[in-house]
Amino acid sequence: FAQTPQQELERLQQNYIQSFISNDDRMASLVELLSGIQPEMEISDQVVVELHQRYPFNVEKIAGYMETIREDGSWPDINYNDQKRSGWSVKEHADRVLGLAKLYRAEEGDCHWEPKLESVIHLALGYWFREKPVCKNWWYNQIGVPKTLGPAFLLMKEQLNPEEKEAAIEVMENAKFGMTGQNKVWL
């Protein structure tokens, strides 16, 4: 049957969300393999980025993020003054937001729709939206951060207030499609 463009968009969003939080048989073998591989600290390959985003939840690690987040939404172990062009440590903040959002939406476990977890996500997003971190390397600003926070925004779409949605759109508008060369494959 024919769907309206809005219905098609909603279906695409739901499929994308499921690809991040699904724990079905199709993903089980990938998750099992990923569980045995130590995540890389510096990522420079699109395939590795996408695999990292599908790593199984480390509930203990995420619980640590929930315990250590500061009142302003930052974490004490992230160097927010990092000026490196490669291995920008501030991106870890975006990675944590995605991990928190995945756990919040995952149906298995005790954190599904958990209010404390949701408040930590809002706190962390608030920091990002307020401070608007920028790396000297355009890749993080135009590809790395939007590619990480985009899924988090979709996972939290129904929980974001209008101001957060506007700020999320601003982050995503940093993804530029006018580039040429190899980096086009990231977008």
Question: What do these predicted ranges mean?
Answer:
Residues S22-N23, V48, Y55-N58, G64:
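Catalytic-loop region of hydrolases
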Residues I21-M41, A63-L187:
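Aromatic-lined, polymer-binding surfaces characteristic
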Residues F1-Q7:
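Bacterial Sec-dependent N-terminal signal peptides
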Residues Q6, V48-P56, E118:
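Generic detection of long, well-ordered alpha-helical segments
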